[in-house]
């Protein structure tokens, strides 16, 4: 059976450009060479690694520079590194700053840091979204005071696709002297990022057609930071361990492709997603999780729906048998199909949330395949 893969928000298939970059590296004299070595090949590998940093910094924009790019293993490590390292770094500089603010719709790699931070003596406050899944600046303001060290709100939600007002949120955090981090894993490479006022952000290669196992934190040089690992002093002392040059080059190749083709792909994928929404939600048995899908504040290629009369697991298995690969939400927590914490935070009932589906794709999924998917799901729902 030929499968139609519709789980790009979990991980996107590798792009040809990224695969070609890996092949070029493997055939080069620096294949397997440690970029921290002082000999000629080591220095050459280091130059290639720094070149990849520059490409990624340009793709992100926001006046980030190559030295701001800290390579890591992916989004989860990047979020851990950013939040823990920045919170402790800020508090070491100003002991009054012992509060961290998250939103209730963050990825588990952020939310699961709450007990860790509390053990370290921080207070953790949670900002809640409105019914459409957006964190408004007004919801943040009531949580902020001079004790806040760091605010972390994701750029775009990994389940609903709702884009957050990051510019306003960063300004709000800065008014009380707090720094602002955003998890941009779902947004990077798919929409233009407005991050001039963001102090740090997290991205991951495998969401944009790069390899699994590599991501990056982009952090301004002025940001106070306490390293969360110890060893060889790599990544300017912010993340220790020998870097994976092969994956960094493939990451950069995917990022460069996304930057070059961003406008065209955003328009075409948005049009396809809107058609999927309109087709599916014409059924009285299917509802969108948020009305934001029709506007500019929604990720292209993310379709988030609910089928209250059925559970997600049944829907996923029936679609899988028909050759369509979708998910119920974040792949990092999909081993247990309980009601989504994101949808619950939006005020959606548990019964409705248990019937949620996430369909995600980019320009490589054809309109014909999406039409067939819609017809198949409508037949399953009845």
Regions found by a protein language model. Give the residues of each.
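Pyridoxal 5′-phosphate
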Residues: 1-382
């Amino acid at each position: 059976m030929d499968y139609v893969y519709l789980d790009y928000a979990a991980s996107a298939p590798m792009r040809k450009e990224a695969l070609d970059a890996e092949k070029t590296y493997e055939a080069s004299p620096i294949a397997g060479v440690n970029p921290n070595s002082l000999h000629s090949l080591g220095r050459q590998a280091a130059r290639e690694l720094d070149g990849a940093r520059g490409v990624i910094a340009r793709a992100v924009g926001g006046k980030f520079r190559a030295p701001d790019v800290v390579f890591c293993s992916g989004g989860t490590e990047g979020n851990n590194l950013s939040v823990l390292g920045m919170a402790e770094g800020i508090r070491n500089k100003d002991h009054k700053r012992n509060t961290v603010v998250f939103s209730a719709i963050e990825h588990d790699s952020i939310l699961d840091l709450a007990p860790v931070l509390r053990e370290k003596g921080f207070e953790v406050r949670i900002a809640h979204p409105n019914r459409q899944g957006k964190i408004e600046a007004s919801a943040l303001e009531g949580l902020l005071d001079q004790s806040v060290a760091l605010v972390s709100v994701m750029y775009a939600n990994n389940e609903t696709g709702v884009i957050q007002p990051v510019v306003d949120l960063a300004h709000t955090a800065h008014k009380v002297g707090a720094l602002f981090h955003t998890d941009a894993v779902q947004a990077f490479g798919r929409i233009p990022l407005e991050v001039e006022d963001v102090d740090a952000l997290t991205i991951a290669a495998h969401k944009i057609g790069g390899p699994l196992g590599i991501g990056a934190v982009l952090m301004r040089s002025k940001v106070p930071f306490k390293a969360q690992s110890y060893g060889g002093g790599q990544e300017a002392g912010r993340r220790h361990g020998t870097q994976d040059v092969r994956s960094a080059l493939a990451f950069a190749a995917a990022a460069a492709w996304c930057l070059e083709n961003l406008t065209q792909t955003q328009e075409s994928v948005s049009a396809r997603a809107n058609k999927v929404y309109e087709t599916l939600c014409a059924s009285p048995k299917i509802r969108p999780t948020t009305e934001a899908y029709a506007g500019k504040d929604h990720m292209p290629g993310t379709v988030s729906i609910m089928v209250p009369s059925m559970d997600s697991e049944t829907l996923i298995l029936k679609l899988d048998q028909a050759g369509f690969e979708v998910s119920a939400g974040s792949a990092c927590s999909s081993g247990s199909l309980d009601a989504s914490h994101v949808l619950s935070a939006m005020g959606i009932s548990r019964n409705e949330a248990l019937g949620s589906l996430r369909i995600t794709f980019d320009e490589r999924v054809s309109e014909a395949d999406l039409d067939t998917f819609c017809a198949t799901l409508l037949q399953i729902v009845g």
